[in-house]
Amino acid sequence: MKFAIALFDPPHSPAARRALRFSEAALAGGHEIVRLFFYQDGVHSASANVVSGQDEFDLPAAWRELVERNGLDAVVCIAAALRRGVLNAEEAERYGRPGANLGAPWELSGLGQLHEAAQSADRLVCFGGDR
């Protein structure tokens, strides 16, 4: 089965941890993830500036490792990211900000990428965003 995964909640939320575990289990079960899409507060999971407490699970590092190990397509919504200060080098320069906190393996792109992923996957599975 082909999955598209969308994460709407920040790294410290239960939904973010469930999204990671679901993704790991799907891959371990031989399924395909066509795209990971980070939207709303989920964009913080891609930020290099998130620091987890010493006794806490480092979810952003776990996402990065999963994406790199499996060669996954990991897209961060550009509009949501900009509003939350999650910038790659190009956007930091464009807006005159002192530094970027988003790099490989993440890609900034638009909401159309979520739509495209949903169309090419058998299932779109969303985590969080139920406030």
UniProtKB/Swiss-Prot annotation:
Catalytic residues as annotated in Swiss-Prot or TrEMBL: 77
EC number: 2.8.1.-
Signal peptide positions (record): none
Class in the EC hierarchy, top level: transferase
GO biological process assignments: tRNA wobble position uridine thiolation
Function: Could be part of a sulfur-relay system.
Gene Ontology CC annotation, any one: cytosol
Protein name from the UniProt record: Sulfurtransferase TusD homolog
A GO MF label: sulfurtransferase activity
Keywords annotated in UniProt: Cytoplasm, Transferase
GN (gene name): tusD
Subcellular location: Cytoplasm
Superkingdom of source: Bacteria
Lineage: Bacteria, Pseudomonadati, Pseudomonadota, Gammaproteobacteria, Pseudomonadales
Assigned protein family: Belongs to the DsrE/TusD family.
InterPro entries, per the entry: DsrEFH-like, Sulphur_relay_DsrE/F-like, Sulphur_relay_TusD/DsrE
Pfam families (UniProt xref): DsrE (PF02635)
